[in-house]
Regions:
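Solvent-exposed, non-transmembrane regions of membrane-associated and secreted proteins
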Residues: 1-231
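C-terminal single-pass membrane-anchor helix
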Residues: 221-261
Length: 261
């Protein structure tokens, strides 16, 4: 039973961690004074102004020896958790923490912002790129990213700003094909990257969006506590199946004993 429930329970635990982390982030941002928020945002925009070319590192390369650099590791940091912002994908009913960099440790627990790409604060001639795994037994993350279609939106919540991006390109490329992640002069872009095909991981799925006005979704993203009902349903269903199996097994044994007599 434990083996059967492991993916569901571990994923819900990961979502709980994201839920708590996002709540802590929002609370921390609320407690910051306006001057500090303005400083962090100005610092990030200055960084982007001096960053004119994206340099892409493959987050899913087994030989990835990525190490955070300074001062990148302090950009948009409101505390010492390594959290940069959080990503919301209404279509998938998911909210995910975005951390600095793409180390193996980061990608085991959340979304990683690829250092070498624009910081996720928007603006002309910027292109921020974020990566996450598919199919981790312990976390859903970008597992269902292939369900996104043109016209869908995703949001980046950073400090006290909410950036909306509408998907305008979906591409599948080889890991070394990174030209689609370049900065496009005058455009404000964001791309989500994961492995594909599912379980094979020889290519990369790129879901790109361009900046549009942010309008809060009419249907709010499902909260962790609402998702707990999924776990209850899974447990009840599994218990029912096991109960039926036990009954069938007992009936079978009783009939078998009667036949032997």
């Amino acid at each position: 039973m434990g083996i059967l429930l492991y993916p569901t329970i571990s994923n819900l635990w990961n979502e709980y961690i994201h839920f708590v982390s996002i709540g802590h982030y929002e609370e921390t941002v609320t407690e910051l004074d306006t001057a500090e928020i303005d400083r962090l945002m100005a610092e990030a925009r200055d960084y982007n102004a001096n960053h004119t070319k994206n340099v892409i590192m493959d987050a899913f390369d087994d030989d990835n020896q990525y190490v955070l650099t300074h001062p990148y590791d302090t950009m948009l940091a409101v505390d010492s958790t390594g959290m940069m912002c959080y990503l919301e994908i209404p279509k998938l009913k998911e909210k995910m923490v975005v951390y600095h960099g793409i180390s193996a440790k980061v990608l085991e627990r959340g979304v990683g912002h690829i250092e070498g790409t624009s910081l996720p604060v928007g603006g002309e001639s910027t292109h921020t790129v974020m990566s996450a795994h598919r199919g981790l037994p312990s976390a859903k993350l970008f597992t269902n990213l292939d369900q996104i279609v043109l016209g869908d939106q995703f949001y980046i919540h950073v400090l006290n700003e909410h950036l909306a991006y509408e998907v305008d390109e979906i591409n599948v490329v080889l890991p070394e094909e990174t030209s689609l992640l370049d900065i496009v002069p005058g455009q404000d872009l964001a791309t989500l990257v994961t492995c594909t095909p599912y379980g094979v991981n020889t290519h990369r799925l790129l879901v790109r969006g361009h900046r549009v006005p942010y309008v809060p979704p009419e249907e709010p993203t499902v909260t962790f506590w609402e998702k707990m009902s999924e776990l209850k349903f899974a447990i009840i269903t599994l218990l029912a199946v096991l109960l039926i199996a036990d009954i069938v097994f007992i009936v079978f044994r009783v009939r078998r004993k009667k036949k032997k007599r």
